Amino acid sequence: MSLLSFLLGEKKKTASVAKERLQIILAHERSGRSAGQPDYLPALQRELVAVISKYVKINADDLKVHFERQDDLEVLEVKIELPEATAK
């Protein structure tokens, strides 16, 4: 948008606005997908261990968090190894 268009009050066409927004979204997604795993995974794992430990005695090694991307599908897998129940 030029200065003259701005001063005269001419508006951008909706198609060009939509195209610019799509380019921004695509650039954002591409930059985020280049990284292997999200930054929040270690914190998520620690918090899960803390919450589960309130109810069941587990070690940090008993919980595994795995994040995987395939094409446009993202999978967050959480595996928890629970201790065997003892008879009372």
Curated annotation (Swiss-Prot):
Name of the protein this chain belongs to: Cell division topological specificity factor
- Tell me if Cell cycle is a UniProt keyword of this record: yes
| Keyword line | Cell cycle, Cell division
Any one biological process term the GO annotation gives: cell division
InterPro entries documented for this protein = MinE, MinE_sf
Q: What does this protein do?
A: Prevents the cell division inhibition by proteins MinC and MinD at internal division sites while permitting inhibition at polar sites. This ensures cell division at the proper site by restricting the formation of a division septum at the midpoint of the long axis of the cell.
The record ties this protein, via HAMAP family, to: MinE
Q: Which family does it belong to?
A: Belongs to the MinE family.
